[in-house]
Amino acid sequence: MPAFDIVSEVDNVELKNAVDNATRELATRFDFRGVDASFELKGENIKIKAEDDFQLSQLVDILRGNLAKRGVDARAMDIKDAVHSGKNFYQDIDFKQGVDTLIAKKLVKEIKASKIKVQAAIQGEQLRITGKKRDDLQAVMALVREGDFGQPFQFTNFRD
């Protein structure tokens, strides 16, 4: 029986490249000359630092642009609130890895409501979709792409 998995993961190499490119762009920007601003990548967490709240939003925009250039979906970003400490503002950005249980349940509910003849099973941080016809599986892929679940999804392990 044909099957595939729905996963949500961020490529760490592309994430590192995007942060490096954003740091390079930050060094060449005229409005950040003489300003203490930086990006710091630790695992799947990026810590940004700037002297002003407005500059933090500019840094997030720079990062979003570089993520888009590298093919990383910006919907995977989980932006925390800005923290003011001393003369600097700090902000943490986490990246969502894996399909959260609540989102997985919402996906299963949406797939069942569409009346497509497939079975959806939650397996840890991924969803396994199984059906008799490849066309049904492709219809589920289109349904997931169209839906707004607040998280990007990838389709892996397609079996015939």
Curated annotation (Swiss-Prot):
UniProt KW keywords: Nucleotide-binding
Classification via CDD domains: YajQ_like (cd11740)
GO function term, MF aspect, one: nucleotide binding
Transmembrane segments: none
Any one annotated GO CC term: cytosol
Highest taxon in the source lineage: Bacteria
Keyword Nucleotide-binding listed: yes
Family per record: Belongs to the YajQ family.
PANTHER family documented for this protein: UPF0234 PROTEIN YAJQ
Function: Nucleotide-binding protein.
Name of the protein in question: Nucleotide-binding protein VF_1240
Lineage of source species: Bacteria, Pseudomonadati, Pseudomonadota, Gammaproteobacteria, Vibrionales
